[in-house]
C-alpha cells in the first residue's frame, strides 16, 4: 500500500492543500514547531476525520482534552469524507503547548479542498461498475478473486469492414457492448480545476494493446471520442463545469501471447499545474486482464455443423452433405454449408479453423481461430464467419510456410478433468508434435505460444508425427456420456482390430472380406489380413505410438483405463509414416449423443459389418447413437475422414474462466 501524501505545516501562514475524498493525508506536525513546545493537539472541520497513528508501547492515548507528546513519533492522518463545495472550505488546526495546563504557544492552520477522484471498473465481475470496490490494481484468479476483464473487440458490427478493433472511431453504438465500462469520478469545486487537471494514462506498451473511448452522452457516434490507444498513451481529461463523473469504454486489441501476459493498466492523476514543474497530487489505477480465447470440447452441446460442398473426379459430394444434414437434424443442430465458390474446392474445414469463444461478465461471443494453413478456405473465416458478435483471430508464420501439423485437425481439447489436486475446469488443449523423436514436425511456435498464453486450458503436446498427415484427430476423440465421469476417451487400436478379426476367424468367418461393398477398392479377407506380416508389423509399430500417447493422456488428464475405449482400427506404413488402412473411425464428428462415424466397410458377418457392430457394442451402452457415414471416396482416399471435413461450433462453458486458478 502506498504511503499517504504528506503536507508540511507552517507557523507563519496558513497552508493550503488538496486532498481526495476517502484518501489519507499525512499532516506533518513536526515541520515547524514553536520553541519550548512539548505537546500538541489537533482539531478540525466536521467533514474531516482525524486519526492519530502511534506505537502503543511508547505512548498511551491521552484522556479527555489532554495533548499528545511531540517526542513519541505520533503521526496525524486526516481523511475528508465528503466533497468540498468551495475552495479550501475544510480546516485542520494544530496547537502547540509547553505543558498540559498552559495556553497554546502557537497554531498551524491547514485549509483543505476535498475532491472526489476515482477510476472505477468492474472489479467485482458482476457486469456493473461499483465505485471504490477493493484493490483495483491487483488482478486475482479464483472464486474469491477480483479484477476487471477486457474483451478483445475482434468481432465486426458493421458489414464490409475489418474487425472493430482496427477502427479509430466508434462505428456503431452496439460496439459499446463489446467494451468494458470505466467511470472517472471528478467531483469538486470548478475553481479547483482551473489550476489542476486530470490526466488519463497507459504505459506505451499497454497503449498498443487497448483503446479508450470517452462518452459524452447522447446517441450520436460523435459523442464517443477515442482518447487513448496505439497513437496516444495519455489524455488530458476535458472536465465540464459541475461534472462529477465521466464515462469511458475500454476495448482490448490483442490476446495474451508469448510477449503479453494479458494484464493491462490504466491510471488517472490529479495534477497541480501551478508550479513550474507540474506536480501529481493523487493517482488512482486499475488493472484489466484480457479475456482468453477458450476452446470447447466434444462434450459441449453442438450449435452449428459446418461442411464444404466440393466437386472432384467422383462428382459432387451431395450424398455426404445429405448425410450431414440428417445427422444435424437428429442432433437439433444447424447445418452450415460452405459453397465451392467460398472454399475453392478445399474440403478440410476442420484443418482451416477452430471455434472458441471469449467471455466477460458483461458480454460473451464466439471467436473463430483461423489457422496459418492458408489454402482454399483461407478467406472463409474472415469473410463469412466474422460478423456482429462473432470474432476472429489468427496467427501467421513469418518467413516460412505452414507444415501439416499447423492445421487444426492437430488441435483438440479435452473435457474438464482433475489431475491429482489440480482442476482443469475448462479441459486441456491437445496438440500433436514429434516428441519423443529427437527431430521432426511440430506445430509452429507462434501457434503454440498463443495457445499456452491463454493459461486456462494448459496445453499437452502429444506424439502425432508418426502419421503421414500428423494430426491428433487421427487417433483420438472424446465422446460425452451420461454417467458420473461425463466422457470417454476413444483411441484407435490396431491390437483391438486384429483381436476382433482373430475372433471372427475362429468363429469360422475367415473368408469374410474387408471393403465389401466398395467398387473402387480390392477386397481382402480376414484370413489374408491376419496372414499379412507387413500389416502386422506396421500395426505393432502404430500400437506402440498410440500406447505412448495413451500413457501421456492418462498422466496429463488424470484418466484411468476405465475412462478409455479402444476403437478397432488398422494402419499401414507408407515409408516411415502411417495411414489408415480403412476409414478411420475415431475421426468422427460428435454432435451430442449422435456420432457421425466413417463407415469402415468391414467384413460382413450375417449381413452386418463386424467393425460397426463392435463399435456399437462399445459406445451405445454409454447412451450414444452411432451413425456410420460413407466418406470413402471424397475424404478417406485423400487421407482424411469426417472430422477432417467438418467443424462444429459448440455452446460455451457455463463455468467462468476467471474462477479458475491456472
UniProtKB/Swiss-Prot annotation:
Residues that coordinate or bind Ca(2+) 4: 350, 408, 411
Enzyme Commission numbers on file: 3.5.3.15
Sequence positions that bind Ca(2+) 1: 153, 155, 157, 164, 175, 178
InterPro entries assigned: Cupredoxin (IPR008972), PAD (IPR004303), PAD_C (IPR013530), PAD_central_sf (IPR036556), PAD_N (IPR013732), PAD_N_sf (IPR038685), Prot_Arg_deaminase_cen_dom (IPR013733)
Main location: cytoplasm
Source species, domain of life: Eukaryota
GO cellular component, one term: cytosol
Function field: Catalyzes the deimination of arginine residues of proteins.
The protein's name in its UniProt record: Protein-arginine deiminase type-1
The species this protein was found in: Mus musculus (Mouse)
